[in-house]
Amino acid sequence: MELQTKSPTTQNDFSQHTPMMRQYLRIKAEYPDLLVFYRMGDFYELFYDDAKKAAKLLNITLTARGQSAGHAIPMAGVPYHAVENYLTKLVRLGESVVICEQIGDPATSKGPVAREVTRIITPGTVSDEALLDEHRDNTLMVIHQEKDRFGIATLDITSGRFLIQEIISENALFAEIERIRPAELLISEENSVHPLKADSIKRRPPWEFDHATALTLLCQQFQTKSLDGFGITHLPLAITAAGCLLQYVNYTQKSALPHIHSIQAEQNEEALFIDANTRRNLELITNLQGEEVHSLAWLLDHTATPMGSRLLRRWINRPLRDQILLQQRQNAVSTLLEKRNYSEIYENLRHIGDLERIVARIALRSARPRDLMQLRQALGVLPTLHQQLTNLPLNKQLQEIKNNLGLFDELFRLLQKAIIENPPIVIRDGGVIADGYDAPLDELRNMSTNSHQFLIDLEQQERERTKINTVKVGYNRIHGYYIEISRAQAKQAPTEYIRRQTLKNVERYITPELKIFEDKVLSSRSRALAREKELYEQLLDTLIEKLIPLQQCASAIANLDVLNTLAERADTLNFNAPQFCDYPIIKIEAGRHPIVENVMTDPFMPNDTHLDEKRRMLIITGPNMGGKSTYMRQTALITLLAYIGSFVPAKNAQLGPIDRIFTRIGAADDLASGRSTFMVEMTETAAILHNATEESLVLMDEVGRGTSTFDGLSLAYACASYLATKLKAFALFATHYFELTALASTLQAVKNVHLDAVEHEEKIIFLHALREGPANKSYGLQVAQLAGIPRSVIQHARQKLEELENPVISETQQPQQNELFLPIENPVLTQLDKLNPDNLTPKQALDILYQLIQLRQQK
């Protein structure tokens, strides 16, 4: 039979369906864009388009149920006990899911079992441990655009961290998206911004982006009359975005959000600006293949707690400019390193677990029994951590951590008394609350588990009380509990005995006491479970009262974990403390690339870097594979490590104020956007030339290589000149255009360096050592030979190279200048030598470029 292709939810015609399907369709109509998991017995079922989509995404069977307008209804399902695995996959694919549970009893329901939506799971609002990556913040982002300005609001519902900011360019917006990497991104249906890259993008109606509504919602959430106390009133676009975000979270959670009790503005000037391209090139969180291995986070993350791991990534992603705060971090690392007690602190921290997310689940009332067990274990560790910090000479950073750790002795004792040692995963089936915690619960449990002993005791009690030796207490399924007396002694039955059944030889009775017991026993299990759930909710109420100090404790532990990890990494990897200066300088002695050094088997060759007010740019030459890119990246990584408060892989390092780090290293076609490799390269270069300042660190590798020799050389020359003379940024400029080394003779702030190599028996040996002055040879053929180019091709190339370097003019041939290897007298280069880059604007540089092209064509 043909499957139905159009869902009746789009037709609003439910009349041809069964009552159960009508119930489903009414619910589905409220959530047209979400997958509805509809509980039916032991399965969650999906219908129509939801079924088709789920079958494809989850690789489950697509079947059919009943008919709709003569067509079979598509259906797919998953077992209820395995639903979390399927939800995890869907969320990671960017899908959102509605969970519709049975809340009625099928045995007593007249018509369809009552059902209601109990959970809405979206990628950015999920809080279940099984659905989350413990190393990554799970952030919901909202962007509100007005003309060329953007308001941004972000919330990590698993921590309560609520942040806003405003941005004035698309480039900065894309940099923030790359930094935050939201799990879910909301934008207005009217948003005109360039296509965004995020895991899950949803468009919201324009009326959700209303400033007045946002103010009202935020004040209600924070229980304030205004937002003045948060210092955000100067950010109207961001406030509007925050209002949309709060509406969405309220819609998905169907519960209060007590752990979201504050909002904070992120100031862009507080942090180093790192654009999306630079973030990828430096491999901060993932490598160039998108994997975490061999990234900076991979190297540094030896944290003991998941929340410490996430905080470390936030530090890496957002280096600070405040040298005072950075010095405090560095001093804390020094203290932990000097005392060599980071191992003991680590051992205690690893017992704490993901306290940050546990506290959030408590606030959302979705905490499971094992969350409370882990919380109890964490609270039990705090006194030891307090003592370990007390034994240290505490600087401001460590003192704040100790103060915020807190001691929760009362909560610890409560959880110790209330929760069994190893509780089940869920409260649903009971067995979570410890014996002895609650007398009514103990009584209900005793009735359920010790009813046989009660009957024995009651029988003995009644025999003694009535003096009737044939008294028996029993039970059957029809009549329930009874007291049995032989017919011969029935006349001696006490007056409070109520006849329940007469048999041939015995009479059976019930007493008020036995009736009460019967009612209790028959309902004791369900009542015990209900009582457990009631007590569990009371525990959550008690914990929610301590929500803010528990959040502060979790934050303090995360900070301690990161600082402790940086101390361990410094010791293990031989990092040293950098020195911060208030004047322009980047001076690194024996610097090393932290990741390359860690993964290579041979000893790493350390190199110096020296940039200051009079030495702004290094033109770096040398062979391919000689280490130019590694050298540039290590300089940037050392700078970045210092600006997160870490020690650095160098013997010594002096660093002045840095506001931005830019890289232009490598490029590939952007086929999706229709951009060639050269266009990508020029776009990245333009972004640097427009945004770099004299406090920026700029890495540029092989600018101009994607076009013809003259175009590329001219562009590289003009860009290097502009960086050195107009922007005066700290720049490492790697090139194979040896003509660029002439800049050092005309511009005082430009110096030449090269990565050394030697040739032996037509083979190249890379020394990877930085030397002053330009390289004298490119070693291109030797590198090609190393790459496996056939020997015959290499020999042919050598012959051609000799011809080009030493041209022989035949008698019948007019002398011709080879286009690829012009002598220095070439008019194009002569014209370049006459230029004064100090007086060039970008427009003038472009005009000169066209003149040079014309000159070349005329020749």
Curated annotation (Swiss-Prot):
SMART domains: MUTSac (SM00534), MUTSd (SM00533). GO terms for cellular component: cytosol. Gene3D superfamilies: 1.10.1420.10, 6.10.140.430, DNA repair protein MutS, domain I (3.40.1170.10), MutS, connector domain (3.30.420.110), P-loop containing nucleotide triphosphate hydrolases (3.40.50.300). ATP binds at residues 622-629. GO terms for molecular function: ATP binding; ATP-dependent DNA damage sensor activity; damaged DNA binding; mismatched DNA binding. It comes from the Bacteria. One of its GO terms (biological process) is mismatch repair. Keywords: ATP-binding, DNA damage, DNA repair, DNA-binding, Nucleotide-binding. This protein is involved in the repair of mismatches in DNA. It is possible that it carries out the mismatch recognition step. This protein has a weak ATPase activity. Belongs to the DNA mismatch repair MutS family. This is DNA mismatch repair protein MutS.
